[in-house]
Amino acid sequence: MNKFLSNRGYSLIELVVVIVIIGILATITLRSMSGTNSVARVEQTTRQLERIAHAIAGDPNLVSGGVRANYGYIGDVGGLPPDLDALVANPGGYTTWKGPYIQDELTPDATNTRFKLDGWGQAISYSGGATVSSSGGGSSIITRSLASTVTALLRNRVTVSITDLAGVPPGTIYRDSVKALFDIPNGAGGVTTKIEFPSRDGFLTYDSITIGQHLLRIVYTPENDTLRRQVHVDPGTVVPIDIQLFRKVW
């Protein structure tokens, strides 16, 4: 008995079912890819905001000799940058500017401007305050703080106690024989030297000090002896400095 092979094709219903299944699988795949791509863009943006924050206010994780070694643009210039371009180009012939403070990742170009774009290719927002942010591709804003407040970056305090080798403060008679000179960047491209004389108990205070590493000089004027100390000022701090002169002088 001869057997006949069926050459019947697929029915319309079967074709529709196959097409529907393919469509469902394609939708699932696209959604998965879209979700993965979105996560990657968020991660890229978060990393970019952190790099910009470190360029402006320094990286607290960069330490040398047990002390913080990096304070970014603010530490050098003494003020917030007017815009992100000031991180890669001197904003006005500032002698204290030591940039560029940031470089484009992977493929830096001559303009060095890609760092200003988030993971969606949109401009990162910075208006001279204590945060940088991204629109997050229109879904949700992504923000990175430079510090708790602008005050924490620009208005810290340094207190100084001065005694001689015997631990004796200058008193009323000798308080004018010693002076403290504190060199700090003034925010306009130069350096300001703040001069103070101690109280009779040997204390003096400097206010409105920006973050950074600043030079403090203590001068015993009768002999013009000078003691130098590098002062590290972190955000939102009061920095106590104890100075003892080289010998008994009072």
Please place each PLM-identified region on the residue numbering:
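N-terminal single-pass transmembrane signal-anchor helix
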Residues: 2, 6-37, 41, 48
